[in-house]
Amino acid sequence: MKRWVGSLIILVLFILQTTLVDYIKIFNTKPDLTLIGVITAALFCDQKWALLLGLCAGALKDTFATQALGINTVFFFLWSVLVIKARRRFSLDFNGARALLIGIIVFLQAVVTRVIFLYLGIPVALGIFLRTAILGSAYTALVSLAVFKVLRIK
């Protein structure tokens, strides 16, 4: 994937996430399109560019997030590193495997974020956390299949 294409994909997905995705919430949970873009870049772009895109996408999401500042910047970069390492070790040749990887990463992002919030003294109810973690990861994985279809990734 060319550099400008990866940047454009992440930018378009971020704009969609901040504007239109609010209208397709399921149980007040919406997919993380920016994370889909970061993982797609980590899967298909060269290593340095994918890491830079992960860092920039995390910083972009942090500017509009109400969470602790910097959490997405750090974790999007780390997810990019892990996906780059995983693509060397595992066969991620079909969209089902990629969607499963995205679902797992979104679930881990929710778990790590909750642990950080608990450490910072910000309580998150268990029911809200479970709904966000389970439904959010499944919803994001399903939406990633649609994103791959639109991008014509096979």
Map each language-model feature to its residues.
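Terminal, non-globular segments
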Residues: 1-154
